[in-house]
Design a protein with these regions (language model features):
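Bacterial Sec-dependent N-terminal signal peptides
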Residues: 1-23
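Generic secretory/membrane-interface signal
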Residues: 11-13, 37, 62, 116, ...
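Short intrinsically disordered, low-complexity segments
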Residues: 15-17, 52, 154
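Immediate post-signal-peptide N-terminus of mature secreted/exported proteins
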Residues: 19-69
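Surface-exposed, polar helix/loop patches in the mature regions of secreted/periplasmic/lumenal proteins
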Residues: 73-156
Length: 156
């Protein structure tokens, strides 16, 4: 399990040197490539799949509900999501006991569900990863990642 987490962290720790307006596109591109790369472990590919689904959902809902929103908003949310997931795996890898890991999982899940961005009523879609034991990234798609990340960072 620890090896898997370390591999996931390494895959997620891709350096982003893109300019601010390219963050969303860069994370999406790298995540799509990782999700399709059969040489990567299934767990790494599942994390990348979550990122792709989340980024596509975010863009779709932003266009639908906030047509005047800027590319910068998508970049900011995408970067915060990337940081949130990296911090999640970092803290999981640091946890020694199963109870600590369960507490970390609960804190991150709660931060994602308690910080809704779009207030989407399509719960089947929004919660498609939330209680799905097949994925480590059991987070709501309808998340304000900036707020969720701030919540997690404020509670160590």
């Amino acid at each position: 399990m620890k090896k898997i987490l370390i591999l996931v962290l390494m895959a997620c720790a891709t350096a982003f040197t893109a300019q601010a307006q390219e963050v969303y596109k860069r994370i999406l591109k790298v995540s799509k490539q990782t999700a399709a790369d059969k040489s990567k472990s299934i767990d790494v590919r599942k994390v990348a799949t979550f990122k792709v689904d989340e980024l596509n959902y975010m863009a779709m809902k932003s266009k639908e509900l906030m047509p005047d929103s800027t590319v910068r908003m998508l970049d900011t949310q995408a970067y915060a999501m990337h940081e949130f997931i990296n911090l999640f795996f970092k803290r999981l890898s640091e946890a020694k006991k199963k109870t600590q890991k369960e507490l970390i999982m609960a804190r991150f899940k709660n931060a994602s569900i308690n910080n809704s961005r779009f207030n989407d009523m399509d719960k089947e879609l929004v919660l498609s990863y939330y209680d799905n034991g097949n994925y480590m990234t059991q987070f709501s798609l309808d998340t304000d990642w900036v707020k969720a990340l701030a919540e997690i960072r404020s509670k160590r």
